[in-house]
């Protein structure tokens, strides 16, 4: 049984987009360097045109390395004391969930990308979530 897509936020804005966030872990035994290299130099080039074909508005990767996580020591306070241990956040901004569903049904995706994910990702531990994007600041300006 498929759940209905929740409505857009109640402010009646048509500018809201969905953001699919994959909270990723690298494959066990893979170095941080090799994980990032595979995602940015192998997987991304194979995926980017397909994302454009199916209407993805933006796709970003945030790699959380040992070095970048060490910066958290400067930010920890009583309210923000729990540090996420994910290796990467991959975010896709979509106008419509159906676009992403069509992308995953594309024969090229199934043939090339499903297997590629197993080469770098711990797909059993990785998680995902989706939510509405509300932009507050863009390019240093309040929107």
From Swiss-Prot:
Secalonic acids show unprecedented anticancer activities against various human cancer cells and might be interesting for further derivatization, targeting diseases such as cancer. It catalyses: atrochrysone carboxylate + H(+) = atrochrysone + CO2. It is an enzyme of class 4 (lyase). Keywords: Lyase. Residues 28-123 form the EthD domain. GO terms for molecular function: lyase activity; oxidoreductase activity. Its EC number is 4.1.1.-. Gene3D superfamilies: 3.30.70.100. Pathway: Secondary metabolite biosynthesis. It comes from the Eukaryota. Decarboxylase; part of the gene cluster that mediates the biosynthesis of the tetrahydroxanthone dimer secalonic acid D. The pathway begins with the synthesis of atrochrysone thioester by the polyketide synthase AacuL. The atrochrysone carboxyl ACP thioesterase AacuM then breaks the thioester bond and releases the atrochrysone carboxylic acid from AacuL. Atrochrysone carboxylic acid is decarboxylated by the decarboxylase AacuI, and oxidized by the anthrone oxygenase AacuG to yield emodin. Emodin is then reduced to emodin hydroquinone by a yet unidentified oxidoreductase. Belongs to the tpcK family. This is Decarboxylase AacuI.
């Amino acid at each position: 049984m498929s759940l209905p897509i929740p409505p857009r936020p109640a402010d009646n804005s048509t500018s809201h987009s969905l953001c699919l966030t994959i909270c990723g872990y690298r494959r066990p035994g893979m170095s941080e360097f090799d994980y990032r290299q595979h995602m940015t130099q192998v997987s991304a080039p194979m995926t980017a045109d397909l994302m454009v074909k199916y209407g993805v508005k933006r796709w970003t990767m945030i790699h959380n390395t040992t070095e970048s996580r060490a910066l958290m020591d400067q930010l920890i306070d009583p309210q923000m004391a729990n540090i996420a241990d994910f290796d990467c956040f991959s975010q896709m901004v979509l106008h419509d969930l159906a676009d992403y569903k069509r992308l995953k049904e594309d024969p090229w995706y199934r043939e090339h990308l499903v297997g590629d994910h197993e080469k770098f990702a711990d797909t059993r531990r990785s998680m995902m979530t989706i939510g509405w994007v509300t932009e507050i600041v863009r390019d240093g300006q309040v929107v």
